[in-house]
A protein has these predicted regions:
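Conserved HGGG/HGGXW glycine-rich cap/lid loop of the alpha/beta-hydrolase fold
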Residues: 14, 22-23
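Active-site-proximal cap/loop segments of hydrolase catalytic domains
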Residues: 30, 43-236
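Short amphipathic alpha-helix adjacent to the substrate-entry channel of hydrolases
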Residues: 24-44
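N-terminal cap/lid segment of alpha/beta-hydrolase-fold proteins
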Residues: 1-7
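Short, Asp-centered acidic motifs that coordinate Mg2+ and/or phosphate
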Residues: 10-11, 40, 127
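Active-site/binding-pocket entry motifs
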Residues: 18-21, 134-136
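Acidic helix/loop microenvironments that form the catalytic cleft of cell-wall polysaccharide enzymes
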Residues: 17-19, 109-110
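Short beta-strand element of the alpha/beta-hydrolase
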Residues: 7-17
Length: 236
């Protein structure tokens, strides 16, 4: 696996920022693991994340699907100049990103964004691993969805990714726990069904007895290895 391969870790999650002075331990460990596999790991906080003011926060209202993806695409396009600038500033030699081999992986909203990336931005993202993605917002908690999508059913339909299934042209792995009581597995089943109906090849990994995030160290480790192997094949 060449070090010129890039990987984007989606972080444009409403209300959550990953780019902070003190990096979350779990985020740091995950990033280091992927870097050790030979990837450039990129984290980008887009519109809707915290710490940038009300206008930034509300930019995703009724349109989080388009806005959060747009910011991740912009981050990919900015990557070569950003790395060159950082190398010049620090005097440290850094690998050049291969923008033809950019993958996105994520969990929960990050899973939604990862699946969306290969469905709606295949020119920027060559593959994706989507864990526990909320593919249809009508299936999710109203206290969350109404804050960002309001009440109009048409808005929910517009921000769903199920209808985008026929667009899939890039490798996609779906991962979901059967016991997930946060984002129910019906979300991934619904997207997988739509992909099958459209004749779109994809990988679906259902996890028996696993909730939204696995607390089984062996399962967590094997999930990383399976995603790594999937991306190694997808990004050849």
């Amino acid at each position: 696996m060449k070090f010129t391969t890039s990987r984007s870790t989606p972080s444009s999650v409403p209300r959550i920022s990953r780019i902070t002075k003190h990096t979350l331990l779990l985020t740091a460990h995950s990033a280091k693991w992927w870097a050790d596999q030979g990837y450039i790991v990129v984290t980008a906080d887009g519109r809707g994340t915290t710490g940038r003011g009300p206008k930034w926060d509300r930019a995703i209202y009724e349109n989080m699907k388009a806005v959060t993806l747009e910011d991740q695409v912009d981050a990919v396009h900015a990557l070569p100049d950003a790395i060159a600038s950082l190398a010049a500033e620090t005097g440290v030699s850094m690998p050049k990103p291969d923008l033809d081999k950019v993958a996105m992986i994520g969990w929960s909203y990050g899973g939604f964004l990862s699946a969306l990336a290969v469905l709606d931005a295949p020119d920027a993202f060559a593959a994706a691993c989507a864990g526990a993605p909320p593919t249809d917002w009508t299936l999710y908690d109203t206290h969350y969805t109404e804050r960002y999508l309001g009440l109009d059913p048409a808005t929910y339909e517009r921000n769903s990714i199920v209808a985008d299934a026929p667009k899939l042209s890039r490798p996609l792995m779906l991962i979901h726990g059967f016991a997930d009581d946060n984002v129910t597995i019906a979300n991934s089943l619904r997207l997988s069904q739509a992909l099958m109906a459209a004749g779109r090849k994809h990988t679906f990994l259902p996890l028996n007895g696993i909730t939204h995030m696995t607390n089984d160290a062996t399962v967590a480790r094997n999930l990383l290895l399976l995603q790594r192997d999937f991306l190694a094949d997808a990004l050849v």
